[in-house]
Amino acid sequence: MPDVLPREGIRLGLSADNRWDAVRQCGAVLEELGAVEEGYARTMLEREQSISTYVGEGVAIPHGTDASRALVRRTTLAVLQFPIGVSWDGERVTTCVAIAAKGDEHVAVLSSLAQILLEPDQAEKLRSSSDPNEIHHLLQSISKDIQE
């Protein structure tokens, strides 16, 4: 099984005008990775309009609607870091963990991500690391949980 979080899906030092721009960028990376069909980014925006994907600690998890699963070629994560931050319903998001899931894998992502965010040192690394390898290593537990 291919890596759920490919290293080329980790993008650091980005900027976004607003949360909608950040979500569009997330969708574009998933499409660039070949994980989703064209149109998936639009469903990510639809999801965000219906309910915020902000999960706390400066992290959001943009993902598509349930109906968009037909557009997912393979379950994949991408990490986009916005060091300056993006306003997200009054919160400041510095990291987006974009999710393309064929099934209910997003539940495992949430569970594993929650464990990382509960550890202040790990949460800080996720938000501020300038090393893609460090981010990849930090999030390997999520990949393993999804692949099990």
Question: What is each PLM-predicted segment?
Answer:
Residues 1-148:
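Cytosolic covalent-transfer regions centered on His/Cys nucleophiles
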